[in-house]
Amino acid sequence: MRGLFAVLFVGLLFCSVTGFGQGMGMSDNPIYKPYYDSLKQMNYPYKLPILGKQAYKRGYDIQYAYGISGIYFTQRQDIDIQSIQIGFNGSQMVDLSNFIKFGPTVANTNAYTVRPDIWLLPFLNVYGIIGGGTTETNVSLIEPVGFETVQNFKADSYGLGVTLAGAVGPIFLAWDNNYNFVDVEAIVEPMPAFNSSLRVGHTIMSPSKPQKSLSVWGGVFYQSLQNDTKGSLNLTEIFPDFGNGFVFDSLRDWSATLPPAQRLVANQIIDALEEMSNGVNVENATVDYLLEKKVAAPFNLIFGAQYQFNKHWILRTELGVFGKRSQFLLNLNYRIPGLKKVR
């Protein structure tokens, strides 16, 4: 079963790639006092972030302004189908939500993205997302017939995001938000999603080198999706092997129980499926659809760690658990200070 149900969930799986970075660091440990005192005396030479000089004067060690990350992200997520409308060969679509029953729908993804970012302010980071990947979607149909399929797809993703970061004593906070689109050829238009995450953590600095540090955190992740997906797919893409083991009498009995408008569309599709199973070419037969869906659980917990080797290189990892979503992220970030101020 290719397209109609499976492709609708591809976009959900690349939308969770978020950006996160600590904007500022400070420590009361007397071991680091000479280092932070030197920051207070330094004339911050770079254009960005804005207010960077003031941050140094207050003793905050801020990241270099410009960065680029390579990110690997994998996720498993459950999807709930709320309603479905179907048409055939351009006919008016009819609501079959009360007559088709889906079982569990589970999507697994592997995504690879590049994320350029800029600290505009010591506490404000903006970034872009561009990448792609693959996903495996498991869809099961319970009624009118039992049917399961596993499909694999490729998709491209792009988006924009913003992170607010700060600290309260030894505890740092980061609030990340992004709006992401996933483009799959089989879907009429890119699928948007809004992602938000809040992290609370602590940074442990190297005893001898303040620019080295280990950060750990916990938090919560939230995702909101565009509910409706609309498109049109060839019947042979949706049911490439339909007819092998399927009983058309059962489908006829089911369609006989439908209201007239729904029965007309269902019989048209069943007729085409039966012709296809008998070897008749049905390449021009298309199914139009309008699907409403949602993530089964919009919230899940996240736990992560970050090791800063120096001011240039940062390695970050994060694990998402609980809810009906699990995820793992690995992020390597490289940073440069950027342009100096004109004297």
Which role does the model predict for each range below?
Residues 59, 70, 109, 114-122, ...:
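Residues on the lipid-exposed face of transmembrane beta-strands in outer-membrane beta-barrel proteins
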Residues 66-71, 126-128, 171-175, 196, ...:
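Transmembrane beta-strands of outer-membrane beta-barrel proteins
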Residues 64, 108-112, 152-158, 188-196, ...:
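Residues that define the transmembrane beta-barrel architecture of outer-membrane proteins
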Residues 180-310:
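Outer-membrane beta-barrel transmembrane domain signature
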Residues 72-78, 130-136, 166-170, 177-185, ...:
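Transmembrane beta-strands of outer-membrane beta-barrel pores
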Residues 22-108:
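Short glycine/proline- and aromatic-enriched beta-strand/turn motifs that initiate or cap beta-hairpins
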Residues 80-87, 137-145, 180, 184-191, ...:
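Outer-membrane beta-barrel translocator domains and adjoining extracellular loop/strand segments
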